[in-house]
């Protein structure tokens, strides 16, 4: 297989017929138009303000909406706010809200819900702030029922992107068990270990995004062989799989593939010995053969990375970093010796156990590191434990994981700011922090150059070993149309339909 950088649709029509329960309907309710698809892991939290998992986000984007939304290109479009104004000094944002929106629990959407949302997220409501993104927010006020003004302490060019955050209804306290949003799909149920069910929102305000299906059944199924079996037997209508797995399908399917703006990385804890020595981190850069990982783990369906940026972010992407580190074991050994580690050392790679490709990648890396006398032990841990141990507490030496795509470069590169709570790489460079701050108030042209310099700084410091952007692979029944890729995690159920 060859690498692909653009969406490919390959019809796989084979001779074997598959028979099972009826396609597109549930066994119990044959009068509904149903799509059955999988998600790789359990939802980490049904409350969108508390969730951190990309799989959860991909599904629940259908349930929740922000003041602004995004299209297939990543461009911002009106959401719950039909328009907005930004003051000349960049400090005041005025949002003009839709007046025809109803939450799934029947509550009419209005300015009070926006005020509640942003006071909760920023801590302005008196409680502990739920998101560091809104620490710059000094006030949020309802001008009238459908106009809200937000004021910032300092101008921030990324702020509008942040308003994609889910707006939740004031006074509703059951989000973690029975989530309520305004989106085109309504949460019906979650059966732990089995499935999430979403129903069409019959009262959805936007006719252009009105779902064409009645119900989506999202099965929690991360094992590729199980997904393939379910597709083959007709128990799934669509499946999220890995590239090499799709070749094993027989029957009438379409394989959709596209880069997903994800960064798979071998993250090194920069504050822990021996990774507090930049020479060791640089040695690892030279010792890891990314082509071997891309070909062996992802069957060639991935794009090699050189910093924490995918080429999908073309406007901001620094294409001058591709030759900074090339696979060179001798150079890696030289750097290890300079750092005093000629005889190597032992490390642990802590990997979330529900992501097989990250485990596979860790296994390849472990073999490669033997060439520089590094003995790597792979420690698979459950997703919840990984989130607490690594993502929250940075209590690890190394990890292999995928960082989800973001629409604004500040969201991507802000992960490495020294005081960012989820900087689990523990990267600390005051000059880098300064560049990120400068970018907040810079012009569009200046931001491009600042973010390119940030990428160079991360690469020079070898803050992590960035591996690849794995292609997203979605297999659908040949009559199921409308599957659309986005530069962030999103399974857009509203676009799916069956061709008659």
In which residue ranges do the predicted regions lie?
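Structural transition elements
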Residues: 303-338, 356-358
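N-terminal lobe/hinge region of extracytoplasmic solute-binding protein
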Residues: 38-88, 119, 180
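Surface-exposed binding/hinge segments that line
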Residues: 85, 89, 129-171, 189-191
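Extracellular/periplasmic solute-recognition and catalytic clefts
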Residues: 139-141, 188-197, 217-272
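Detector for C-terminal structural segments
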Residues: 287-315, 357-366, 387-500
């Amino acid at each position: 297989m060859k690498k692909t950088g653009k969406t490919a649709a390959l019809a796989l029509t084979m001779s074997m017929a598959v028979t099972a329960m009826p396609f597109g309907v549930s066994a119990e309710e044959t009068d509904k138009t149903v799509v059955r698809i999988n998600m790789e892991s359990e939802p980490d939290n049904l409350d969108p303000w508390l969730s951190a998992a990309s799989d959860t986000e991909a599904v629940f984007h259908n349930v929740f909406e922000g003041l602004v939304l995004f299209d297939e290109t990543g461009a911002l479009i009106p959401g719950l706010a039909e328009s907005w104004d930004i003051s000349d000094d960049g400090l005041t944002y005025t949002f003009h809200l839709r007046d025809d929106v109803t939450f799934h629990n029947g509550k009419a959407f209005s300015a009070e819900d926006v005020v509640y949302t942003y006071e909760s997220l920023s801590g302005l409501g008196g409680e502990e702030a739920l998101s560091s993104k809104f620490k710059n927010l000094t006030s949020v006020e309802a001008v009238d029922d459908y106009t809200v003004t937000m004021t910032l302490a300092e101008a921030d060019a990324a702020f509008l992107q942040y308003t994609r955050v889910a707006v939740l209804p004031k006074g509703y306290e059951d989000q973690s068990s029975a989530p309520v949003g305004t989106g085109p799909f309504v949460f019906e149920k979650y059966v732990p270990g089995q499935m999430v069910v979403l129903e069409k929102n019959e009262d959805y305000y936007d006719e252009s995004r009105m779902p064409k299906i009645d119900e989506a059944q999202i099965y929690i199924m991360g094992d590729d062989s199980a997904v393939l079996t379910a597709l083959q037997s007709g128990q799934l209508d669509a499946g999220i799989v890995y590239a090499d797995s799709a070749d094993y399908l027989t029957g009438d399917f379409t394989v959709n593939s596209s880069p997903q703006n994800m960064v798979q990385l071998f993250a090194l804890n920069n504050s822990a010995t021996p990774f507090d020595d930049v020479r060791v981190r640089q040695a690892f850069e030279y010792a890891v053969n990314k082509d071997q990982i891309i070909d062996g783990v992802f069957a060639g369906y991935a794009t090699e990375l050189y910093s924490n940026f995918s080429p999908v972010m073309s406007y901001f992407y620094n294409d001058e970093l591709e030759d900074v580190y090339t696979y060179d074991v001798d150079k890696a050994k030289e750097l290890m010796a300079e750092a005093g580690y000629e005889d190597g050392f032992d490390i642990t790679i802590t990997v979330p156990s529900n992501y097989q490709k990250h485990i596979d990648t860790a296994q390849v890396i472990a073999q490669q590191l033997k060439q520089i006398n590094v003995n790597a032990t792979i420690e698979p841990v459950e997703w919840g434990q990984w989130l607490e141990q690594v993502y929250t507490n940075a209590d690890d030496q190394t990890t292999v994981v995928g960082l989800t795509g973001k629409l604004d470069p500040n969201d991507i590169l802000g992960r490495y700011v020294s005081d960012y709570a989820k900087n689990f790489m523990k990267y600390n460079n005051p000059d880098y922090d300064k560049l990120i701050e400068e970018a907040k108030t810079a012009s569009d042209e200046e931001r491009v150059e600042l973010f390119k310099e940030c990428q160079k700084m991360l690469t020079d410091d070898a803050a992590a070993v960035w591996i690849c952007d794995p292609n997203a692979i979605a297999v659908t029944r040949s009559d199921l149309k409308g599957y659309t890729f986005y530069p962030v995690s999103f399974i857009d159920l509203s676009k799916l339909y069956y061709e008659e």
